[in-house]
């Protein structure tokens, strides 16, 4: 049974559980505040219904927690692992559409002398610099050795891509500073 194109969350959950072996719903939710959260967001209210659906569909199996009988852990079934592998092998058909408020606001400013433009650009520069510092810190913390890079190479590449994007955005912002009057 496949997932509709728009439902990506089940694959994200499968990947997270595959990476850790088995996790509780709480642990899965926490993953969205760290590594996965750098490029994919999901809330508790989305995750738990999806876990129930995936268990019903037999993509996940419930594993009792020996330390806490009220806490449920999930692990991939053979079918869940096959579905994840099939999804990973399927080429993307389109680039994602970005919901970028900065771009949207800039789009609607017509006059290059509009004072709002300089404010938007400066604010965006500060946000991008903060993001870049955060990403560089994560890279330093997570990938300080060649072995760490080898063990999570895909994660390393995604982090490198994010750093590259932020560096390119800073370069672009430096080049579009509105001309000063005078």
List each model region and its residues.
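Basic helix-turn-helix/winged-helix DNA-binding cores
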Residues: 1-97
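Amphipathic alpha-helical dimerization/coiled-coil segments
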Residues: 86-130
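Mobile beta-alpha loop/short-helix "lid" or hinge segments that flank ligand
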Residues: 96-104, 135-144
């Amino acid at each position: 049974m496949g997932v509709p194109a728009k439902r990506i969350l089940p694959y994200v959950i499968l990947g997270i559980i595959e990476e850790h072996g088995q996790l509780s719903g709480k642990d899965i939710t926490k993953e969205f505040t760290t590594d996965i959260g750098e490029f994919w967001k999901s809330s508790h209210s989305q995750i738990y219904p999806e876990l129930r659906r995936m268990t019903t569909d037999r993509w996940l199996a419930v594993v009792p927690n020996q330390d806490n009988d009220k806490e449920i852990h999930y692990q991939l079934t053979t079918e869940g692992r096959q579905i994840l592998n099939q999804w990973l092998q399927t080429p993307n058909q389109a680039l994602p559409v970005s919901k970028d408020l900065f771009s949207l606001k800039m789009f609607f400013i017509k006059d290059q002398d509009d004072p709002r433009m300089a404010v938007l650009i400066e604010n965006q520069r500060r946000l991008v610099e903060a993001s870049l510092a955060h990403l560089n810190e994560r890279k330093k913390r997570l990938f300080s050795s060649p072995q760490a890079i080898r063990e999570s190479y895909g994660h390393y590449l995604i982090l490198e891509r994010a750093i590259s994007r932020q560096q390119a955005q800073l370069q672009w912002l430096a080049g579009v500073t509105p001309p000063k009057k005078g």
